[in-house]
A protein has these predicted regions:
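Structural signature of tandem alpha-helical TPR/SEL1-like repeats
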Residues: 4, 29-36, 64-73, 98-110, ...
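TPR alpha-solenoid repeat register
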Residues: 17, 53, 87, 121, ...
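Alpha-helical solenoid scaffolds that mediate protein-protein interactions
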Residues: 6-9, 41, 77, 111, ...
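Structural marker of alpha-solenoid helical repeat scaffolds
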Residues: 9-12, 44-46, 80, 114, ...
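C-terminal soluble interaction/assembly domains
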Residues: 172, 178, 182-195, 199-201
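Residue-level recognition of tetratricopeptide repeat
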Residues: 14, 23, 48-50, 59, 84, 93, 118, 127-128, ...
Length: 207
C-alpha cells in the first residue's frame, strides 16, 4: 500500500516519495529497486532530500558492492553538492577504510571548512592523524577542538584517552576512557582501556 501511494505522488513531493520508496525496498533487501528509486531523484530537487538520497545510495552500495563503489558514488554526488558536510564526512570515512588517508584528511578538512562547529569531523581527523601518521601535535589540536565543542561525546572522550595514552599520560588516559565508558559501552573503548592497563603492568584490570 505504501508503495502504491508513493507511486501516485506528483509535483514537489515526488522526491520525498521516491526516498520513501527506496526505504521500503531496502527494508526488504531489494537493493536494485531501491537504487532505481533513488536515481529518479534529480539534482535540482529539494537539497536536503537530494543529499539524503546520495548518502542512502552510498550505504546501499557499501552493503552490496563495497567501499570503492560507495566512495565513487559519493564523489560523483559531491560534484553537484560540494558544500555538503555530510557527504564529505562519509567520503572521508570510506577513504579511511580504503587506506587512503590523504583523501580522508582532505574530506574532513572540507567538512570543517563548511561547518567550523562540526565536532565529529574534528574528532575523526584528529584520531586518524593520531593512528595513521606521526603528526601527534596536529592530531592533539583537532581532538582538543572536538572536545571543546562536545565534551560529553563518548567517542571524543575515547580519542582524548587514546591521545593521552600515546603521550604516556596513563592516569589521564584512564580517566578519559572511563568517562567515555560511562556514556557508551563500546568495545573499542574497552580495548583502549585494557591496553592502557596492560602497558601500566596492571594485567588484572587489563583482563
Amino acid at each position: 500500500k505504501a508503495l502504491d501511494y508513493a507511486s501516485k505522488v506528483k509535483g514537489k513531493l515526488t522526491a520525498a516519495a521516491a526516498l520513501q520508496t527506496a526505504n521500503i525496498y531496502s527494508r526488504e533487501s531489494k537493493w536494485d529497486d531501491a537504487l532505481k528509486a533513488l536515481d529518479t531523484i534529480k539534482e535540482d530537487q529539494e537539497p536536503a532530500i537530494v543529499e539524503e538520497a546520495a548518502l542512502f545510495k552510498a550505504r546501499i552500495l557499501l552493503e552490496t558492492k563495497g567501499e570503492k563503489t560507495a566512495f565513487d558514488a559519493l564523489n560523483a554526488s559531491l560534484i553537484s553538492m560540494p558544500y555538503s558536510k555530510a557527504l564529505h564526512y562519509e567520503a572521508a570515512m570510506l577513504a579511511e577504510r580504503l587506506d587512503d588517508i590523504k583523501t580522508a584528511e582532505f574530506h574532513l578538512k572540507k567538512a570543517i571548512e563548511i561547518d567550523p562547529g562540526f565536532a565529529n569531523a574534528y574528532n575523526s581527523l584528529g584520531y586518524t592523524l593520531l593512528e595513521q601518521t606521526k603528526r601527534i601535535k596536529e592530531a592533539e589540536r583537532y581532538i582538543n577542538q572536538a572536545y571543546q565543542l562536545d565534551p560529553r561525546n563518548p567517542y571524543i572522550l575515547d580519542s582524548k584517552g587514546w591521545l593521552a595514552f600515546k603521550q604516556k599520560k596513563y592516569i589521564k588516559a584512564i580517566e578519559y576512557l572511563n568517562d567515555a565508558l560511562k556514556l557508551q559501552k563500546e568495545l573499542d573503548i574497552y580495548l583502549h582501556l585494557a591496553e592502557v592497563y596492560w602497558t601500566q603492568g596492571n594485567k588484572r584490570k587489563a583482563a
